[in-house]
């Protein structure tokens, strides 16, 4: 059963009416209601607040990494383990083909259902997950394979065990190594891009965000708690943090925004997956045609956070 957010209640009501019209076999009513539904969807989704966009980024029906991998990756083979400690199910790594292009795909997977969410640790990777991702990145470099990364995490796992095994070192090592990989790298934030947990697989030649995804140094709720000691300030925090794709594109922190289906990726995962596939293939062609892509990646990373100070 589809899950509707509070601001989608009118959409839910019209959808229910369409289903009743189908049961009655009333094609005329169905056609009228579908036009009304399209109009309502456009009205709602063209006027979303930043808080509503955050809700969409976390929508329970939103496609996760494994959904996209199942839809766009063919002849796939999953790889496990980090060769040091364990296999982290919050990070998934695959070798396969996207439109006959051999590729390595690395994704953060939140899981569905209680059992699978626990298995995936709710998409919060441990150090062994980031080391598994780095292992696969080095594999891709050795065999000259492009890398697609799918980012979707509330953040790296903050548990004691993770810290004991070097969580910060694992993330920092990925930032260093991914910056100098000698193969094309493309990263897409598909839902939540939470802090260092997202950055660890977001250093790339091309960094894109899905239209209703977020990218932030801390959750808005965490920001509100720290700065104002008041969870009700979450919406204020969202505006101040500038976590939406449009804000981050204007700031030069991401390269592209991938538009979602009219009702969001959670209503049409097939179209969303195809859009990601086409973006990857287009971005890959652009990178491969650039003989200086490594230097351009370096310069892009070095320019982040730069500013000019004037003395008056």
UniProtKB/Swiss-Prot annotation:
InterPro entries: Acetyl_CoA_COase_a_su, ClpP/crotonase-like_dom_sf, COA_CT_C. GO terms for molecular function: acetyl-CoA carboxylase activity; ATP binding; carboxyl- or carbamoyltransferase activity. GO terms for cellular component: acetyl-CoA carboxylase complex. One of its GO terms (biological process) is fatty acid biosynthetic process. It catalyses: N(6)-carboxybiotinyl-L-lysyl-[protein] + acetyl-CoA = N(6)-biotinyl-L-lysyl-[protein] + malonyl-CoA. It holds the Pfam family ACCA. Keywords: ATP-binding, Cytoplasm, Fatty acid biosynthesis, Fatty acid metabolism, Lipid biosynthesis, Lipid metabolism, Nucleotide-binding, Transferase. It is found in: Cytoplasm. Residues 36-286 form the CoA carboxyltransferase C-terminal domain. Its main location: cytoplasm. It comes from the Bacteria. Acetyl-CoA carboxylase is a heterohexamer composed of biotin carboxyl carrier protein (AccB), biotin carboxylase (AccC) and two subunits each of ACCase subunit alpha (AccA) and ACCase subunit beta (AccD). Belongs to the AccA family. This is Acetyl-coenzyme A carboxylase carboxyl transferase subunit alpha. It comes from Helicobacter pylori (strain HPAG1).
